[in-house]
């Protein structure tokens, strides 16, 4: 892997982890489009740990308040949010533990299938953004809503769905304001990224030193770009909603289809 490839993939991860466009789909599709070799599991760990750092740094004050209040005052506004995040994390973590390897094997080189998923979820995102009645603030959400958002996160294993996309969309369907749906999606991302990243890192810890340069580049790039992506999305949803990301999904699906057909000839 070249330095340029490490930076480019770090940018894709930083954007795709927090924007509703699917980081996993981008990390599969773009190396295929450019004819690059598959990146290693160690590098994949670096990318995810980078985005973990991004969300922890961006929301560090929120996380500090949430953890302290969750332990000291569990019935307070921030205290409830602590337990809501835990409730929302369990379904995705369980589903990932049981089925992640199976899903990865099925979707590994199914580029046309990924294009279809990107487009279909693009339509869903567009439709929900158009019809959802967004009135509920983050402080007014309940444990039932948190649980449903957590269950929806399980579907993010499928490349093209997007963890942030499916959780934000579910939040919108449940009546959360767009900013609230986005913020809860970001806040609940840390435990799932931390868990998955820690497990993968422990499995591949012996290979880190051999790939340290690319590991560091991918980590740093995804962290910086991820931080900027969070800021960008929180700003744009207030003005334009999520439709712009649906349009991008349609465009990328069309590009994948075109390349797939050209290479099949």
UniProtKB/Swiss-Prot annotation:
In short, the EC number is 3.6.1.27
One cellular component GO annotation, for this chain's record?
plasma membrane
Which regions form coiled coils?
Answer: none
**What GO biological process terms does the UniProt entry carry, in alphabetical order?**
cell wall organization; peptidoglycan biosynthetic process; regulation of cell shape; response to antibiotic
Write out the catalysed reaction. Answer: di-trans,octa-cis-undecaprenyl diphosphate + H2O = di-trans,octa-cis-undecaprenyl phosphate + phosphate + H(+)
Indicate yes or no for the key word Lipoprotein: no
Q: Give the top-level enzyme category.
A: hydrolase
| Pfam entry (one) | BacA
**How does this protein lie in the membrane?**
Multi-pass membrane protein
Compartments where found: Cell membrane
**Disulfide bonding pattern of the chain:** none
What keywords appear on the UniProt entry? Antibiotic resistance, Cell membrane, Cell shape, Cell wall biogenesis/degradation, Hydrolase, Membrane, Peptidoglycan synthesis, Transmembrane, Transmembrane helix
Which GO MF term does the entry hold, naming one? undecaprenyl-diphosphatase activity
Which InterPro entries has this protein been placed in?
Answer: UppP
Signal sequence, renumbered to the chain: none
Q: Which domain of life is it from?
A: Bacteria
Q: Where are the transmembrane segments?
A: 14-34, 40-60, 79-99, 112-132, 141-161, 182-202, 217-237, 242-262
Is GTP-binding among the key words of this record? no
Matching entries from HAMAP family are given as: Undec_diphosphatase
The misc remark on file is: Bacitracin is thought to be involved in the inhibition of peptidoglycan synthesis by sequestering undecaprenyl diphosphate, thereby reducing the pool of lipid carrier available.
Q: What does this protein do?
A: Catalyzes the dephosphorylation of undecaprenyl diphosphate (UPP). Confers resistance to bacitracin.
Q: Mind telling me which NCBIfam families this protein's record contains?
A: undec_PP_bacA (TIGR00753)
Recorded family membership: Belongs to the UppP family.
The protein's name is Undecaprenyl-diphosphatase
Q: Which organism is it from?
A: Caldicellulosiruptor bescii (strain ATCC BAA-1888 / DSM 6725 / KCTC 15123 / Z-1320)
| Taxonomic lineage of the native organism | Bacteria, Bacillati, Bacillota, Bacillota incertae sedis, Caldicellulosiruptorales
Report which gene this protein is encoded by.
uppP
